[in-house]
């Protein structure tokens, strides 16, 4: 009986677990939103940065490449740093990368900002699921993981639409400032 009750408790007792995981959900949403949002701004960005499509593709490839490198390392990072420090670093990296890209005066600067965004996104994604497993009881994890997956899948679905609205009233720079 005691074993069953232990299985129904979260490993870390948090009074409001949904409130605790909300910043990570927002960070993951924005990370995925940023993945698809630049597609709509392609013509404006290519013209403003004076680059061709093959060079411009690096804004997507660089972002995804960095995420692909950081994701497997995130487990190692949790052994070296506290979860709080990793969350703060991940969110800060994404914000700093967004600002660098938004203020970018040339293609290299925008690309560097995108890659820094990738660092933040690569840290936040796995942390969101790890923290959920710690602060929610096991019997709630199915629901929690479903909601987290919904957040991640919803962002790229609405990314192009929101970007179109942003571009209708602003410039490509505003896309990056929206992430902040």
Q: What residue spans do the PLM features occupy?
A:
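Cytosolic juxtamembrane N-terminal segment immediately preceding the first transmembrane helix
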Residues: 1-33, 47
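Residue-level signal for short hydrophobic patches within transmembrane helices
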Residues: 18-30, 62, 89, 96, ...
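Recurrent gating helices in multi-pass secondary carriers
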Residues: 20, 28-39, 67, 156
């Amino acid at each position: 009986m005691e074993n069953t009750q232990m299985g129904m408790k979260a490993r870390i007792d948090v009074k409001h677990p949904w409130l605790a995981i909300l910043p990570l959900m927002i960070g993951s949403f924005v990370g995925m939103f940023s993945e698809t949002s630049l597609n709509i701004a392609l013509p404006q960005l290519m013209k403003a940065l004076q680059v061709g499509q093959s060079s411009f593709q690096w804004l997507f490839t660089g972002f995804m490449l960095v995420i692909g490198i950081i994701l497997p390392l995130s487990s190692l990072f949790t052994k070296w740093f506290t979860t709080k420090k990793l969350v703060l670093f991940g969110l800060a990296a994404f914000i700093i990368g967004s600002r660098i890209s938004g203020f970018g005066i040339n293609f290299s600067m925008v690309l560097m900002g995108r890659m820094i965004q990738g660092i933040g996104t690569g840290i936040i994604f796995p942390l969101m699921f790890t923290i959920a497993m710690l602060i929610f009881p096991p019997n709630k994890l199915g629901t929690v993981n479903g909601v987290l997956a919904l957040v991640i899948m919803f962002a790229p679905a609405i990314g192009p639409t929101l970007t179109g609205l942003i571009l209708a009233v602003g410039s490509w720079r505003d896309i990056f400032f929206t992430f902040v």
